[in-house]
Amino acid sequence: MRYPLGEALLALYRWRGPLINAGVGGHGYTYLLGAEANRFVFANADAFSWSQTFESLVPVDGPTALIVSDGADHRRRRSVVAPGLRHHHVQRYVATMVSNIDTVIDGWQPGQRLDIYQELRSAVRRSTAESLFGQRLAVHSDFLGEQLQPLLDLTRRPPQVMRLQQRVNSPGWRRAMAARKRIDDLIDAQIADARTAPRPDDHMLTTLISGCSEEGTTLSDNEIRDSIVSLITAGYETTSGALAWAIYALLTVPGTWESAASEVARVLGGRVPAADDLSALTYLNGVVHETLRLYSPGVISARRVLRDLWFDGHRIRAGRLLIFSAYVTHRLPEIWPEPTEFRPLRWDPNAADYRKPAPHEFIPFSGGLHRCIGAVMATTEMTVILARLVARAMLQLPAQRTHRIRAANFAALRPWPGLTVEIRKSAPAQ
């Protein structure tokens, strides 16, 4: 599966090299492509503004979310949010992840056709809400999905279109703002309740309420609310898309589903996966990483340049929008042999040709000071869900498909208009 925008950037890189300027002066674009370009971007984090780059995400994530935070505000907020998403915390959520995907699989019947992408969106949204914030938000998972959708629809349009919608107060803008108000009211009430009557399963909510930054300050209720919304939104929007692509690959690359199912059966012996089992699922981990390589959620990413920079003898003027690309980096043959082939075994440390990529060579979660704080959560959830799928079900793509599957949405790559599969077998949960 190839994405036209990504392919155009890849062709541009091969033709012009790592730096391409478009537009005039400080108001144009600079394309900085390839692994060394990524290293440069991550090493110069203080030269870019996230708030100016991602202002179009404010209606969804809120004005204090990490993705629109710069400098001291970003460091302070991240120092409170990040500890709750470290590996040892995420391991405690594996049982919740298993329970949520099992509930979805329990509803499947042999011969049934369904959009696996939509099924996974619902499962991941509830799993993320329950894992991080307990039942107090998990019970509202469907409501949150309904209210977030008009906001996500805004972000799938160019920023210029969103600004126009805001300026003219279009019906779509009004629907989105009304939805955000309903989300805010719900989460504000849950924050207030958690302060007065905390629960054992509040998990991340407890971290956000009681955590202190390195300077000893706590988050405001607005910052807590924006953190909750952005964690749920980013978690299910990107992870469900990546999972759909993983299933697409497993169903279209000969032998991959069988290899994954065989490994899960051998390692788990019919048990549900526990946190300690995941590292032993070498092939399945390869499926996850290979999916994130070929189908990175973000085809491109951008940074607004705050001060003049020099890269490889070329000046990058302040004010320009710098664009770099995981899609390009992940398809360079000098880094990835046979780059367009889906090869889970390239991630096996025991393979003769194994090569661990450098941080600037594999960037599905970006890198540097602004690397996605949910990376461990996402890869863990993908591994758990795929392990249950190959253990309990057999899927296939319909022999007669009514539409061609395409890649859509450069910010959270997803199959469009969905991924219809047929259930061949669905076994009861062990």
Swiss-Prot record:
For the ligand (heme), the binding residues are 372
Cellular component annotations (GO), alphabetically ordered:
peptidoglycan-based cell wall
Sample GO molecular function, one term: monooxygenase activity
Q: Transmembrane residues, as ranges?
A: none
Broad EC category: oxidoreductase
As cofactor, the record names:
heme
Pfam families recorded: p450
**InterPro entries given for it?**
Cyt_P450 (IPR001128), Cyt_P450_CS (IPR017972), Cyt_P450_E_grp-IV (IPR002403), Cyt_P450_sf (IPR036396), Cytochrome_P450_monoxygenase (IPR050121)
| Enzyme Commission number(s) from the entry | 1.14.-.-
Q: What UniProt keywords are attached to this protein's entry? A: Heme, Iron, Metal-binding, Monooxygenase, Oxidoreductase
The reply on keyword Mitochondrion is no
Q: Which PANTHER family match?
A: CYTOCHROME P450 (PTHR24305), CYTOCHROME P450 12A4, MITOCHONDRIAL-RELATED (PTHR24305:SF166)
Family the entry assigns: Belongs to the cytochrome P450 family.
Q: What protein is this chain from?
A: Putative cytochrome P450 139
What species does this protein belong to? Mycobacterium tuberculosis (strain ATCC 25618 / H37Rv)
